A protein has these predicted regions:
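Terminal accessory/targeting
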Residues: 1-46, 58, 62-72, 183-240
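Catalytic domains of cell-wall/extracellular-matrix polysaccharide-remodeling enzymes
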Residues: 59, 105-214, 219-234
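Active-site beta->alpha N-cap acidic-glycine motif
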Residues: 30-121, 125, 133
Length: 240
């Protein structure tokens, strides 16, 4: 009886050890909460423009959820109606949401009134869905000038890695361009309206996880790098 009990206890000890090792090998499970200790690992932020589009954005959210990865979505205002459930899902699953203008307009070419219709109108729509107004701004085409900076009333986020996924709809090429250029602190630009971009994004996540990278939202990336985001200031990335 004693030997059997020892063997049984030994079996369960090995089983629990195996489970523990397996758990540590899994992809990241959560985004660090504000105030938590800084992460000692290379960090990047995945960002997606021009959504939401129901088919592709939903697939992307599924893939990110499976991997425990947060991203930042810069939405087009006129595409919000009918996709409110996706936006709520983004919020619930730990993603960050930003403004990409109501109609994807060059903000540098607009009067103050037209700027408000493009940016403040979308901010109001998001407020009605999420109950808050603190959204980052990414101007379409990366178009920024002094007037945009003055009118933004929020931090302006561009990017530091652009695989031009809109130009060549090829998941292999998009993945390659990102992996050849990405570094700790980068903000990666993609578009969640293309199936090839969704595929490339998830490949990039899997490959960079294997290399020890972790993924965070734009605001969390800035915090981890010791940068306080300021209204009207332009940020392209957070490399050291």
């Amino acid at each position: 009886m004693g030997r059997f009990w020892l063997r049984k206890r030994g079996f369960w000890a090995l089983f629990l050890l195996f489970c523990g090792l397996f758990a540590f090998s899994r992809p990241q499970a959560a985004v660090p909460a504000e105030g938590e200790a800084l992460i000692e690992a290379p960090l990047v932020a995945l960002t997606f423009d021009d959504g939401p589009r129901r088919s592709t954005t939903a697939d992307l959210l599924d893939g990110l959820q499976e991997r425990g990865v947060p991203a930042t979505f810069f939405l087009i205002g006129e595409q919000i109606e009918g996709t409110e459930d996706l936006i709520k899902r983004m919020e619930e699953e730990g993603h960050q949401i930003g403004i990409h203008s109501y109609e994807h307009r060059w903000l540098t070419a607009l009067s103050a009134a037209d700027f408000a219709r493009q940016v403040d109108r979308e901010r109001q729509l998001l407020y009605e869905i999420l109950g808050r107004e603190d959204f980052l701004l990414r101007p379409p085409y990366g178009g920024v000038d002094a007037a945009v900076e003055k009118r933004a009333n929020t931090p302006i986020v561009l990017w530091s890695v652009d695989p031009e996924d809109w130009k060549e709809l090829d998941a292999d090429r998009v993945t390659q361009r990102i992996l050849e250029n990405v570094e700790d602190g980068d903000v990666i630009l993609l578009h969640d309206i293309y199936p090839t971009s969704v595929e490339a994004a998830l490949r990039v996540v899997d490959t960079l996880h294997e290399k020890g990278f972790l993924f965070v939202t734009v605001s969390e990336l800035a915090r981890q790098k010791g940068i306080e985001l300021e209204n009207g200031k332009v940020y392209r990335g957070f490399r050291g």
